[in-house]
């Protein structure tokens, strides 16, 4: 099922959206608890609002301002009271048709906000990061959505 940006909430998994890229940064490397990772950031939106998108790994730097893209299997987090969308190794991003899609100037400025209890400065807990194998051992996903 496809979501609208205005309906995004923290800790959603398997998120599918079609959005226009309003701003896009170049890829850069950052240090995380799992080592050096490549990311880029973008502001994307639809007729219901706009959201910050963090592109991890192979997706970093892959989208350009003005494009309309379909994003499949993304996830959301909360940071400083705002919902953020994330695209990792299991996410698919493809260019989509612009037919009938709002122009950048028609996309509202509003952004989805996190509930009051999730307004900390750190990365929101995704809840789905834990995976249990046949032996009951816990496996954790990193920022790119890959199991460790």
Curated annotation (Swiss-Prot):
Keywords annotated in UniProt: Chromosome, Cytoplasm, DNA-binding
Signal sequence bounds: none
Residue ranges the UniProt entry marks as DNA-binding: 19-88
Disordered: annotated segments: 90-148
GO biological process: double-strand break repair via homologous recombination; response to ionizing radiation
Principal subcellular localization: cytoplasm
Gene3D superfamilies, alphabetized: Nucleic acid-binding proteins (2.40.50.140)
Outcome, altering residue 30 to A: Slight decrease in ssDNA binding
Effect caused by changing residue 79 to A: Significantly weaker ssDNA binding
Basic residues bias locations: 128-137
Pfam families: Ssb-like_OB (PF21473)
Ranges of compositional bias, category Polar residues: 103-116
InterPro entries linked to this entry: NA-bd_OB-fold, SOSS-B, Ssb-like_OB
Compartments, as annotated in UniProt: Cytoplasm; Chromosome
Any one Gene Ontology molecular-function term assigned to this protein's record: DNA binding
GO cellular component: a single term: cytoplasm
Family annotation (CDD domains): SoSSB_OBF
Subunit structure, interactors included: Monomer in solution, may bind ssDNA as an array of monomers.
Function: Binds to ssDNA, binds approximately 5 nucleotides per monomer, binding may be slightly cooperative. Inhibits the endonuclease activity of XPF. Stimulates reverse gyrase from S.shibatae strain B12 (rgy).
Name of the featured protein: Single-stranded DNA binding protein Ssb
Gene of this entry: ssb
